């Protein structure tokens, strides 16, 4: 899928806009991990480096492969390391819950990812490191590959949300979800 950061001239465009308009703040949507660029992140931050949003989508490599998000855990952790090394203090990670073939092991993978990113943040920015795990429930829409996938019921999603809330809290990550 197309990402804002795929544009070959995104950094020069951001730099030109922010130098032309002093009070302009530029934001980019959640970034695919495979197209993450510290240069883009730094251009957007323009001195203020708070929270960077990445979209790994699923908590396990098995499930990322199943949904064709060919991003490795190593890619994600490398992006987090680069951001924290350059002074960013927060990483928000966006995941989907209720994907076809998802198991509680996949849900636990989200928590584990939060734990690893938090550890990387602490290594580079100490107690200022903030990690937020944000999830949305899969709602099948027309035309994408999962248009005919069965949507998890509220009773199926509730234990996943509870596990994520408790698990994220135990590893020092914030958790939020959208129904």
Model-based region annotation:
Residues 84, 107-179:
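Auxiliary Fe-S-binding modules of radical SAM enzymes
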